[in-house]
A protein has these predicted regions:
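Flavin-dependent oxidoreductase catalytic cores
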Residues: 1-408
Length: 408
């Protein structure tokens, strides 16, 4: 029998959802995904090759962007915010480790709250996915693991250059235990600042091949101490990080983002099911009151053809790459999904019980009124992929200048 699900305003997407262990009630389940846009303003405007600017703050354009996309009772997850200079992975990304940055993010928070919206701060540590020209220090990693491909380049040329930088030219250093503890402290300090300036919660980015997932990935983490060597030990960093952040700001204010089947930034470790099952079971046991968990859908069609994909998954023993097992582990914890949702494939997902909320990214860039469009079944404006990632001379073009339906 064919099941017909309602769409638009009658969809389950527009039913309330409680997160943060009952502290917050969302009025709808259309969530703004964390989107790096590289539109921050440099703290040092006289950046030179010898003295490059390495710190960015949220300026007027960033405030306007978030304000445009805020809705009453709607959740926005911020772009990835570095908790330290060392953690910064890209130019134009405002961090949260000095007073100027905190003041800028407070303006963003206030703008979202003025619209009745809710905003979480996503903390993001690039780990080995950066270069010394960006941070002023060597990239860090669980192990001194070079990138698999010797031709893999950093995303942006350094200040004063048009030449791409090879990651292989700047191999990461292995983190000492003391360095690991300091990094966790950096996260905790940034999380406390986030709550102090009004963010409604903090999400720890533990996917997409960044530092936490580097610890989880056997092809990157070659340690043989408490932080590596087995699936269980490779989870230890994330366990400690989440527990310490929860102690700092309250468990109900903490969320996590995971990509168990992703391969971004060459996170191509094995024992996927064993590792992420142990991780999720441990998180559910030790932190049962997390605000929510957010998962990135496996989308191998973007990397492989059908035959190549099946061959690859079989080589890993991965015949089932759905998120169902993790949904079952987390039970009543609100479970979010990101990965290609639009105005065609969103309907019936919440009603089926598969996920509690859906994250939208690319279409939010070009549709500041995306929630209204979904609700009223109005077609989406196309996005401009060439303007996803700045910085640009004009940071507002195809960032804050997209009109709403009413403005059209």
């Amino acid at each position: 029998m064919t099941v017909h699900y309602l769409n638009g305003k009658d969809s389950g997407l527009f039913k309330p959802l409680t997160i943060s262990n009952g502290k917050i009630t969302l009025e709808h389940r259309v969530v703004h995904a964390p989107l790096t846009r590289n539109r921050g303003e440099p703290l040092n405007h006289s950046s030179t090759p010898d003295h490059p600017n390495r710190i960015w703050i949220p300026g007027d354009a960033v405030v306007e962007y978030y304000s445009q996309r805020a809705t009453k009772g709607g959740l926005i997850i911020s772009e990835g915010i570095p908790p330290s200079l060392e953690s910064n992975g890209m130019p134009g990304v405002p961090g949260l480790f000095n007073s100027e940055q905190a003041a800028g993010w407070k303006r963003v928070v206030n703008a979202v709250h003025a619209k009745g919206g809710i905003i979480f701060c996503q903390l993001w540590h690039a780990g080995r996915a950066t270069i010394p020209q960006m941070t002023g220090s060597p990239a860090v990693c669980p192990s001194a693991s070079v990138w698999d491909s010797p031709t893999e380049c950093y995303s942006h040329p350094p200040v004063g250059s048009t030449q791409s930088v090879l990651y292989a030219s700047h191999p990461p250093i292995e983190m000492t235990v003391e360095h690991i503890k300091q990094t966790i402290d950096d996260y905790c300090n940034a999380a406390k600042t986030a709550m102090d300036i009004g963010f409604d919660g903090v999400e720890i980015h533990s996917g997409n091949g960044y530092l936490p997932e580097q610890f989880l990935s056997s092809n990157i983490n070659k340690r043989d101490d408490a932080y590596g060597g087995t699936p269980e030990k490779r989870c230890q960093f994330v366990f400690e990080l989440m527990e310490q952040v929860a102690k700092t700001i309250g468990e109900q204010n903490v969320a996590i983002r995971l990509s168990p089947f992703g391969m971004f930034n060459q996170a191509r470790g094995e024992q996927r099911i064993e590792t992420w099952t142990h991780l999720c079971e441990g998180l559910k046991k030790t932190l049962p009151s997390l605000s929510y968990v957010s998962f990135i859908e496996p989308r191998y069609e973007q990397i492989f053809g059908a035959e190549e994909k099946d061959k690859f998954l079989k080589s890993w023993g991965l015949l089932d790459v759905t998120l169902d097992r993790f949904r079952q582990i987390f039970g009543s914890t609100p479970f979010f999904s990101a990965g290609g949702w639009d105005d065609q494939n969103s309907w019936g997902v919440v009603e089926s019980g598969k996920y509690d909320a859906l994250l939208y990214g690319r279409y939010f860039t070009s549709n500041p009124d995306l929630v209204h469009r979904l609700k009223e079944k109005i077609p989406m404006a196309p996005y401009d992929r060439t303007r996803f990632y700045g910085p640009f001379e004009d940071n507002t073009f195809h960032y804050t200048d997209y009109p709403t339906v009413d403005q059209n």
